[in-house]
Amino acid sequence: MLQQLLSNAFTMVLIILVINIVYVSFSTMRLILTMKGRRYAAAFAGTIEMLIYVIGLSIVLDNLDQIQNVIAYALGYGMGIIVGMKIEEKLALGYTTVNVITKELDVDLPRQLREKGYGVTSWVAGGLEGDRTALQILTPRKYELQLYETIKTLDSKAFIISYEPKSIHGGFWVKAVKKRRIKE
């Protein structure tokens, strides 16, 4: 039966496309898990990735004489990157640090963000046109977009920069952010 499926050109293209999408999605996830320090999950994803890779590559190498198979392999690779990135966005592993600089000296913004469950450190910063409020907020990545919307609602002219911290040690943030649920 498998041989019959592989003899149909359209089915072959579809199989190669799907295999490569799944393979590259696992590859993307393995890389992200490795970068996040999740070694066992990365090793598991890598094992699945290689299993799929060997199967997919053997099918393509057995059928290199048909250009549509090579094209399906290449398209599957590109689509797999997109799918892997979408999966990673949905998982939203790790934390993000968001720095906010307000247009005005605003002591109310930190309080409003704290009431919503965010850990906020604030200070007065000197800008070109006077004093501003600067904030640093650590939040799980799954709440990052929600935080941006909250900030924009509270101060539509706020300057926002975010980055992913490599490591976090001690302090209020680590304990509180892990336990805390962000309010909508």
Swiss-Prot record:
HAMAP family: UPF0316. Belongs to the UPF0316 family. The chain crosses the membrane at residues 9-29, 41-61, 67-87. GO terms for cellular component: plasma membrane. The lineage of its organism: Bacteria, Bacillati, Bacillota, Bacilli, Bacillales. PANTHER family: UPF0316 PROTEIN YEBE. NCBIfam families: PRK04164.1-5 (NF003194). InterPro entries: DUF2179 (IPR019264), DUF5698 (IPR044035), UPF0316 (IPR022930). It is found in: Cell membrane. The keyword RNA-binding does not apply. It is a multi-pass membrane protein. It comes from Bacillus pumilus (strain SAFR-032). Signal peptide: none annotated. This is UPF0316 protein BPUM_0594. The keyword Nucleotidyltransferase does not apply. Keywords: Cell membrane, Membrane, Transmembrane, Transmembrane helix. It comes from the Bacteria.
